[in-house]
Amino acid sequence: MNSDLPARPVRIGVQLQPQHAPEYRQIRDAVRRCEDIGVDIAFNWDHFFPLYGDPDGAHFECWTLLAAWAEQTSRIEIGALVTCNSYRNPELLADMARTVDHISGGRLVLGIGSGWKQKDYDEYGYDFGTAGSRLDDLAAALPRIESRLAKLNPPPTRDIPVLIGGGGERKTLRLVAEHADIWHSFASADEYPAKAEVLQRHCSDVGRDPAAIEHSAAVQDGGGLVPNAQALVDVGVTLLTVACDGPGYDLTAAETLCKWRDSR
């Protein structure tokens, strides 16, 4: 285990992918079931079309769902894994986040990234640019979001936690060090320590305590869900996520991880 990180409680997150569910009630029932089985945080994603399966299948919009989830749940945290920075003016996004924070009673996590799915951009009229330009736009947007959150009346109910996903060592991890409360990585347990070390160097460069950043990662099923979860915990990850999609939203993996978390 990375001894430089604090002893945080292990938390379980579920990404309820808002695809292939032709009726909203299917998603609503899934987020309520997440709360019932003890999931700590329910995520969706910020796309306009399915990422797999029928490319033109049923799909719902991210932030409208989060506002509904805020009313339809009472304990679980909610957020996007992750919001695409390109799709909304930073000041507007800050106001949206503040509003959902209030609706939920302080349970929103603001997950954000630079965006990557070209079909979303092309179909909805956004400039796709390059990976580098999108990261530069994210770097410019984050201070604007923070500034607007500080000006809004009423203010957020809490300092809304910011989650940034990705592992780019030069730009993305620098943004994590500067702005994030949670870092979501897509690295395996074997790859993770090297990425975490890069993040620690960025934190040192910007004067940030790396222990202030919670580490999050997706748990893969191949080779065993629980062993894979434990391997991530052993290298310092404490927010463990799994994903499922519609129409059925099978929460078997999430329930397994919740039981494992509670038995530790």
Which residues make up each language-model segment?
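Active-site-adjacent structural elements that line small-molecule/cofactor binding pockets in enzymes
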Residues: 1-264
